[in-house]
Amino acid sequence: VYRQDEMYGTGVGASLCRRNEAFDLPIRKRRDGGWKIPAGTVVFTCFTSYLLRKDAEGWRPECWEWTRRRRDCWFYFFTKRIDRLAECLPPDWGEGYENVIIGCTVENQDRADARLPLFLELPIRHRTVIAAPLLTALDLREYLDPEKIEELTASGESGREARPCHYEWVLSLREQC
């Protein structure tokens, strides 16, 4: 993501936490009073930012409020810092909001073994595992509980400096599912 920011000259780096012009798009309305984002839309949240950052505490409650308000949409975000989720959830989260999908990223076996046990224990209704950037073969069989994991996706890196992602690794994940 940051390579693309650099390529397009946005000057946004991993250390900057900011709200962009589309920050409140999920709750914006058209002139006729309808939602700008129609019902049934999957809202991919914070794909170039990080909802669970400590310095996002000032605006994170707004995001949870929109999620409650727009139960007619799906909100999807993923993180490599799943250990921060519990302290960032809203008080009324319970077992998770029905319209939120949370993905946990893993790029190698070490990260999978560290993140996925916690991910499976957290109160989340809709879970997905994202093997990205897939940097090595993974054995995820012990984590792929079909009662808890709804989806597994895999991808490599892009750009000139991308490290290899081997087809055999992706095929192995499919077979594990």
Set out the residue ranges of the language-model regions:
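Glycine-rich loops and low-complexity Gly/Arg-rich segments
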Residues: 68-72, 104, 127-130
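Radical SAM enzyme [4Fe-4S]-AdoMet core and its adjacent flexible, acidic
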Residues: 5-14, 21, 25, 98-100, ...
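Conserved Radical SAM active-site core
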Residues: 1-100, 109, 138-146
